[in-house]
Amino acid sequence: MTTKPAAEVSVAPGLFQTLKTFPATVHALLFFTFVIRFSYFMAWPFIAVIMTKNYHMSPVAIGVVMTSSALISVVLGMYGGQISDRLGRRIILLLGCGFSAVGYITLAQATGMGLFITGLMIIGVCFAWVDPPVRALMSDLLVDSRRRALALQMRYYLINVAAVFGPLIGIVFGLTSQKGTFLLTGLTYLPFFVYVLLFIPAGKLSGEQKNSAPVIKLHQVIGIIARDRIYIAALLCSMLCSVVYIHYEAVLPQYLMLLDGNAAVKLITVILVTNACTVLLFQSFIMRFLTQVSLPKRILLGGIIFAISQLCFFFIHSTEMWAWLMGTAVFSVGEAILMPNLNIMLDQLAPVEHRGAYLGASTLSTLGVAVGPLIGGVILAMTGAGVFICTALLSVLLCTIIYVCRISMLARLQDP
């Protein structure tokens, strides 16, 4: 099947007709992604609270633990991706589901800090051996770029739905900040494990076998990725996006606390809900209105909007709700454009024969999520609102990289 040009990688008018053409396995993968992330968002956003209240860990110690978990995810992601390229997605998904369930159940049952940290390290496998293989498997099953792009858009949309309602359901049932919630998260991996065991065939799919290359070792795969300048540029953009985004989630609330501790709690809640709702509403229009816009141009547009939103945050020196909601709306539009399209870019730049390893390497973007709060906290302490100038500059750097590499990216994306 001929690959369509990059300008056509998003959704065409027949959205639901296209969704109906997805294999049943893709629908199942999207469903299990939603279920897992829903339970994840009931517990994970409050993990720092648990580590502070239960184990009296300092912000620096929490940052070190989270960064270590992210590093494990990156290393295992490339190794697991290479295994899935050689042996198929099934075996690595089974290992990922099993380890993730064990990790979350360990968090739920931990009676001391050492066991709790051990659980966090095991959870590094969750992102490494579940998330990238799921994306790779969907790409294997959807051979044309247009349907792959739609599947990744839908996956991101479902994750945002989970991000909106997961914490709210957790609050309603009193599950937030409770270690027992991790037990629920761990148990959600078991149905997924059973599905993979029963319905995902062992070995490679027929399409993968046709495109299979001679087996190469992990260090050779890493060398191939390291020499792939276009992919590295896209990966760096993804990391920069993650750093800016995590500043919004982790550093912005601290800044609001500095402005007015009493008003901050309510404002933070309203801002987070506004962000998630704006992303959900706006993304449904993005897929239509940006259909004819090439991927690099979409990412460039999202980066510019990201930079503008950071400048908006910099110039707000009070806790006026309307001002923060306007800034959040601008930020959310940039997020809705950037996040899914960067994922689509990384997917389409990955060679078929090494797709698992390439998508495993894409977990490097989680380093931005891990180290962002630590770096942002230091800059916030030193400069106050100046932290948003730094994130605006990072957004400009993202735009610069995309602009410089846009021609090479387009040429590669348009290759059949």
Role assignments for model-derived ranges:
Residues 2-23, 201-234:
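Juxtamembrane intracellular "pre-TM" segments in multi-pass secondary transporters
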Residues 74-111:
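Conserved MFS/SLC helix-loop-helix module at the cytosolic interface between two early adjacent transmembrane helices
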Residues 76-88, 281-295, 380:
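Helix-to-loop junctions at the C-terminal end of transmembrane segments
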Residues 121-159:
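Cytoplasmic helix-loop-helix junction between adjacent transmembrane helices
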Residues 349-382:
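A late C-terminal transmembrane helix in Major Facilitator Superfamily
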